[in-house]
A protein has these predicted regions:
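Short alpha-helix plus adjacent loop in nuclease-associated cores
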Residues: 117-138
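C-terminal-of-GTPase-core extension/linker across diverse P-loop GTPases
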Residues: 1-16, 37, 148-226, 232, ...
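Switch II of P-loop NTPase G domains
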Residues: 2-5, 31-34, 57-74, 251, ...
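N-terminal accessory targeting/assembly segments
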Residues: 1-119
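Conserved Switch II/interswitch segment of TRAFAC-class P-loop GTPases
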Residues: 23, 55, 59, 94-97, ...
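Switch I (effector-binding) loop of TRAFAC-class P-loop GTPase G-domains
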Residues: 210-213, 234-264, 273-283, 308, ...
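Switch/connector loops and helix/strand junctions flanking conserved nucleotide-binding motifs
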Residues: 24-27, 58-62, 97-102, 119-122, ...
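Conserved catalytic network of the ASCE P-loop NTPase/AAA+ motor domain
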Residues: 8-9, 77-84, 256-260, 265, ...
């Protein structure tokens, strides 16, 4: 097969496409496209244009209507004539094989959807054998129903270079062209092998968790890029990789933390996101087991994000999907130093909205009813960290007494309190 040489220095340009529907208004669509742009940037692409269209629902054949597709095609043509090549078009929903095939036939350009973009980022971020295996399985699950389309367009688009390699063009990292040459039966066999590997990893991880001793397990959960790893570094007093990009953390990091006299285990897990591919959730079972088996969840929220309440809902839904709903939880609102609001003019008589509330006013809304289950901090600026440690200490101590009432390894001050 012909070899493809991909320039490392060249940044691929991308066009984003989203829909405004009855259940997704223009503001929400723009917010979703902002997130999609951040995903594209994390994958190494540069977003140069956005298109939106109002429809009752996505068009079953081409996602957008014929007129909008023609508008996108005209834009790409004009850019090419001006010697500004467009590398790809990314759609903000998962596309069917038929939709991808029809859109590619019309636009004659690489087409990605939100799912394939997220999978690509996971392939780029995967470092350990465990993470690479989980990502590869998820990619094959996504690829299988689209295999015919991938065969058709493989030679024109070029191949990837293996999950975790971080090389190759956006959307094509991971299994790569050698795997795409396989027939359906061979891919199914490969998936079966990957599942066996993950089952063995699950056993090993389960054994490791059982051997950690009589310690309460606390897991950091939350939307992606809310500051979990930064908080992990502060609490554990050890460096944990943190970066202002989505999915900076894929593999679970577990550290032993001691607050005052009380030791416990703290884990930093992969962040959640809207429309998280089901195949990823299924494939990352061994990673998410840290959340499922935790005694206490610290749900970290970026309060400076305009849609933080929806992000809370996304995380809670994902927790329910993986069987971790109903666990003891502390809601930790992070990044209070970055919180902003829109101050209304004195002559503005329109009703105040959430965007007009100061942080102090926001704290007096539904959050005030949560009492000690709700905290406000800045991990970056180390604001209210002592309050957080105090609350975590009390909750971990309560859980420890309940779970290990006869444990005698704790220090004298703790024994006196009991």
């Amino acid at each position: 097969m012909k070899e493809f040489v991909i320039s490392e220095a060249k940044v691929e340009t991308a066009v984003l496409v989203g829909l405004i529907t009855q259940t997704q208004d223009e503001r929400k669509t723009n917010e979703y496209l902002d997130e999609l742009a951040f995903l594209a940037e994390t994958a190494g692409a540069e977003v140069v244009k956005r298109f939106t269209q109002k429809l009752d629902a996505a068009h079953s054949v081409t996602y957008v209507g014929k007129g909008k597709l023609e508008e996108i095609k005209e834009y790409i043509r004009n850019e090419e004539e001006a010697e500004r090549e467009i590398g790809m078009v990314i759609f903000d929903d998962e596309l069917s094989a038929k939709q991808i095939r029809n859109i590619e036939a019309e636009l004659k350009i690489k087409i990605l959807d939100r799912t394939s973009l997220i999978l690509d980022i996971f392939a780029m971020r995967a470092q350990t054998a465990n993470a690479k295996t989980q990502v590869e399985l998820a990619q094959y699950k996504y690829m299988l129903p689209r295999l015919q389309r991938l065969w058709t367009h493989l030679e024109r688009q070029g191949g990837g270079s293996g999950a975790g390699g971080g090389k190759g063009s956006v959307g094509l990292r991971g299994p790569g062209e050698t795997q795409l040459e396989m027939d359906r039966r061979i891919i199914l066999n490969r998936m079966s092998l990957l599942k066996e590997r993950l089952a063995e990893i699950d056993k090993q991880k389960s054994t490791q968790r059982k051997n950690r001793g009589r310690l309460i397990r606390v897991a950091l959960v939350g939307y992606t890029n809310v500051g979990k790893s930064t908080l992990m570094t502060l609490l554990s007093k050890s460096e944990v990789f943190a970066e202002n990009k989505l999915f900076a953390t894929l593999d679970t990091t577990v550290r032993k933390v001691i607050i005052e006299n009380l030791p416990f285990l703290l884990s930093d897990t992969v962040g959640f996101i809207r429309k998280l591919p089901t195949d990823l959730v299924d494939s990352f079972k061994s990673t998410l087991d840290e959340v499922r088996e935790a005694d206490l969840l610290l749900h970290i929220v970026d309060i400076s994000h305009p849609d933080f309440e929806e992000q809370i809902e996304v995380v809670n839904k994902t927790l329910a999907d993986i069987g971790a709903a109903g666990k003891p939880m502390i809601l930790v609102f992070n990044k209070i130093d970055a919180y902003t609001y829109i101050e209304k003019a004195a002559d503005d008589l329109t009703p105040r909205t959430k965007e007009n509330l100061t942080l102090e006013e926001l704290m007096k809304t539904w959050m005030a009813k949560m009492e000690d289950n709700c905290l406000f901090i800045s991990a970056r600026e180390k604001i209210n960290m002592e309050e957080l440690k105090s609350v975590v200490y009390q909750r971990v101590k309560e859980l420890h007494v309940q779970k290990y009432p006869y444990n005698d390894f704790l220090y004298q001050t703790y024994e006196e309190e009991v």
